[in-house]
Amino acid sequence: MAKKGTKPDVATTFSLAGAVWTVEFVNHLDDMGKCDSEKQTISIRSGMNKQSTEQTFYHELVHAIMFTMGKLNHEEEFVDTFGAFLHQYHRTRVTHEA
């Protein structure tokens, strides 16, 4: 299983189609998260618990992927469900050393 700590397990940077995205934590953010496709930045509200922070990251990651695919209209129910499945995968994956 994935490591279980108290600190959220989210990327600080990642690449999609050759573009580097940055993840930042913001003290005063009205929403739980925000995906800015022009700045290639995901902002996450600071101070949330571990699970909310991770779920928000995966939700915003789905937005980032869709923007990268050229999709500008995102159905929130799809984004939320797909992000939750990615988070579940990440939290329950089992790795084996080769």
Residue ranges and their predicted role:
Residues M1-A2, V94-A98:
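Short intrinsically disordered terminal tails
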Residues Q55-F67:
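Active-site recognition of the HExxH zinc-binding catalytic motif
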